[in-house]
Amino acid sequence: MAAAGLPVPPGFVVAAGAFSDFLDACGGAAMIAGVTNDLDVDDRRAVEHAAERIQQLIVSTPLPVPLARAILAAHRKLEHGNLVAVRSSAVSEDGLTASFAGQQESYLNVSADAVLDRVRECWASFFSPRALFYRAQKAVLADTRMAVVVQEMVQADKSGVMFTVDPIRNRRTCMVIEGAPGLGEGIVSGEVTPDHYVVSRDDGSVLEFFVPDEERSRVLSDQELDGLRMLGLRLEAFFGSPQDVEWCSRAGELLLLQSRPITTLGAHG
């Protein structure tokens, strides 16, 4: 997103190749292959045991010194990097048919001395029982491509999610935007009920909206909704497909935190 000139918090990426190198160095790649080759994903205890073995290996193995130094050096370059968000970013070899949204962990308000641990914990979350079961359903169980994004922590006034087309009713003429005060992790996890808006992709007009708390006004103004719409269109143009986006606003500035393909759309709509 940064390469497209879109507004994102400063940060850096621990590339998927670093995870692969880590697994090769600690013997994890061979162990994971052995554990998952004949795994019966319908056997809950077997899946939990496999997950525990893999995750324990990852979190108990120190990062290679060159990688640890590179991560800490990149962290020191962040102007306001005292606290960061450490976000998982997993993509299968066929990323348009398997979205890993919600399968891995992300961490907020991470201090400098905890960054390396949180990177390993993000990697380990790729092998949670839920994630193993999900990838088995998508026939990508052996895929171990996992990047980690480290961003300056944004103390947001408002946060939410945006779908650049309507994924529920399969409407490609409108966007669905949800927003709530403060940080947005509660929306993503389902703990917070946000405002819900449906806006026209063409002109930004608000077609529908729902505010769950009748005692407060809308979280997002028409101007903010239109700003998000414009960013959504730019994201689609950059990635080439409808997007599921996490966003936030700080002092009136809209920032994009994460974007992934929407994988639940039908062929027509």
Which residues fall in each region the model found?
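N-terminal beta-alpha lobe that positions the nucleotide/phosphoryl donor
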Residues: 1-149, 158, 220-223, 230-240, ...
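Short hydrophobic-aromatic micro-motifs
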Residues: 8, 14, 174-178, 188, ...
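Short beta-strand segments
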Residues: 87, 151, 176-178
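Short, flexible loop/turn elements at secondary-structure junctions
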Residues: 90, 152-154, 181, 249-251, ...
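Short beta-strand scaffold segments in enzyme catalytic cores
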Residues: 160-163
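Short conserved beta-strand segments at catalytic cores or DNA/RNA-binding microdomains
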Residues: 165-167
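Conserved catalytic alpha/beta cores of large enzymes that bind or transform nucleotide phosphates
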Residues: 174-251, 269
